Amino acid sequence: MTDTRDVVIVGSGGANIASLTGALERLGADAALSTDADEIRGARAVILPGVGAAADAMTRLHSFGLDALLPALAQPVLGICLGMQLLAAGSEEDDAECLGVVPGRARRLPASPDLPVPHMGWNRVRKDGGSVLLRDVPDGAHFYFIHSYALPLADTTTGRTEYGSEFTAVFESGNFFATQFHPERSSAHGATVLRNFLEHAL
């Protein structure tokens, strides 16, 4: 890692990035929020966070021309929470069409009296094959989630979680990585995930 600004966080709207920026700075990375295509294109690593509705986030990305830019990026990209779902083909939420980096559509989690939706709080992540992001993370480690939609299991899944049914907690596909949980809110294991991404990217 260098002292120059290496990480650009995409301003996808609705996300409080203070905790994410702080977590990256503690790991020695200089990160900045941006919706500027040239700045994003020139970054050594890109993070796509997000909370809220997929359709609203896609509208915001489209307004900056980022819906075409992001899938074409060649540097490492990390999607977090809604950012993970935006990297998929689409979402059942408002029938949104997303960036299409990986196949599949985010589905609403099944609700029950014992398992309310949104899924909020700590849950286990089981490793599913080799994973860059989960290197040095124990199998079954707990991470912090807050979401109502999730991607089904797929060939790109490298970490899975169960909440009513199993869903993809981590995927890795080429230079694209994603977590449904919030690593910046997930204590030491979350810091390890972010460090693994930064070490891979920088």
What is each residue range found by the language model?
Residues 1-8, 26-28, 199-202:
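Short, low-complexity, intrinsically disordered N-terminal peptides in bacterial proteins
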Residues 7-29, 183-185:
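N-terminal beta1-alpha1 ligand-phosphate binding loop
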Residues 26-33, 59-62, 122-128, 160-162:
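Short gly/ser/thr-rich secondary-structure transition/capping motifs
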Residues 31-42:
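Short acidic low-complexity segments
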Residues 39-40, 69, 170:
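Structural alpha-helical scaffold elements that stabilize or flank donor/cofactor-binding regions
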Residues 51-120:
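Cysteine-nucleophile active-site neighborhood
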Residues 72, 105-202:
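Amide-donor transfer/coupling interface in amidating biosynthetic enzymes
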